[in-house]
């Protein structure tokens, strides 16, 4: 058996030497046929791991001026999350998600993956090669038609980490300066983890529940209706500062809110700026 063929087959499939040698022997040295056989072996090995829990992993970002993607690929241990093959796989998936403008997990799973077939097949092959269950769990896609998309991944190594954020800024101002503003906001989002962009975007049921809890707490103070209302409104304002992005104190300067920072940024970009949307991915979070 030609050793060069065995090495080539291993490089192309990522599987072990013994599997590659056996496949070539069974396929009379035909590399193309052996690849098909090894892919079947890889999928079979992956199926055996389907019930295992993949709770570690990484967040990957792929960013361009007007479009950004965040994906979460899970594995079972931090050891595999730091493996070069895992890093290469998730980086490729983020790139494919961006190139194909994937707005859902299913669309990305069915996208083509060069030399393998589909993204889903590449993930299952990765499960076989790395020996742990791999799972593509979440994807965030954000596009800005009249402005920029900026982003930040915490622990950023080649756009990879455990938490990532994208923000959309609507403006006709200087694009490079908008990117700087957007990255600062994305860093804030990663640190403070807001639940909604504005008060209008906050889940109404959650907001009503919070107000009901506060009203119940204030009842025991035996204050007049007018004073009670002021106390409730004040505590709701504090609540908004905790969960609403535009109401939060800016992490780099707590003397102003994010909404104030947005207004100040308009002078540097020479145009009005609107923070129109954001996305946040935290590894392992269900949100």
Swiss-Prot record:
Cellular component, GO annotation: cytoplasm
Compartments it resides in: Cytoplasm
CDD domains for the chain: UBA_EF-Ts
UniProt keyword terms in alphabetical order: Cytoplasm, Elongation factor, Protein biosynthesis
Pfam families: EF_TS
GO terms assigned for molecular function: translation elongation factor activity
Record function comment: Associates with the EF-Tu.GDP complex and induces the exchange of GDP to GTP. It remains bound to the aminoacyl-tRNA.EF-Tu.GTP complex up to the GTP hydrolysis stage on the ribosome.
PANTHER family: ELONGATION FACTOR TS, ELONGATION FACTOR TS, MITOCHONDRIAL
Name of the protein in its database record: Elongation factor Ts
Originating species: Wolbachia sp. subsp. Brugia malayi (strain TRS)
